[in-house]
Amino acid sequence: MVNMKASMSLTFAGLVLLFVVCYASESEEKEFPKEMLSSIFAVDNDFKQEERDCAGYMRECKEKLCCSGYVCSSRWKWCVLPAPWCR
């Protein structure tokens, strides 16, 4: 009887240890993609958007002219792609 209690306690302790190890490795795996994505999409001063002479897609075109390939929408005053039926 004592031998069975000891083996059950040892088995239970082994399962708890296995759970802790698996949980720790899984939490490390969850953090890895977050760290990877944050390093990929980190904003660097060298890559900040520069001021343009023309307005790009979905930018206001009241004061600036739209860049090549875009037209100023008469309804919304944004630079948009030209509609195929308006060419």
Swiss-Prot record:
Covalent S-S links between cysteines: 54-67, 61-72, 66-79
Coiled-coil region(s): none
PROSITE patterns: HWTX_1 (PS60021)
Residues annotated as signal peptide: 1-24
UniProt keyword list: Disulfide bond, Ion channel impairing toxin, Knottin, Secreted, Signal, Toxin
Any Gene Ontology CC annotation: extracellular region
A Pfam family assignment: Toxin_12
Subcellular location: Secreted
Propeptide: 25-52
InterPro entries hit by this protein: Huwentoxin-1, Huwentoxin_CS1
GO MF annotation terms: ion channel inhibitor activity; toxin activity
Tissue: Expressed by the venom gland.
Similarity comment text for this entry: Belongs to the neurotoxin 10 (Hwtx-1) family. 51 (Hntx-8) subfamily. Hntx-8 sub-subfamily.
Physiological role: Ion channel inhibitor.
Entry comment, domain topic: The presence of a 'disulfide through disulfide knot' structurally defines this protein as a knottin.
Protein known as: U3-theraphotoxin-Hhn1a 14
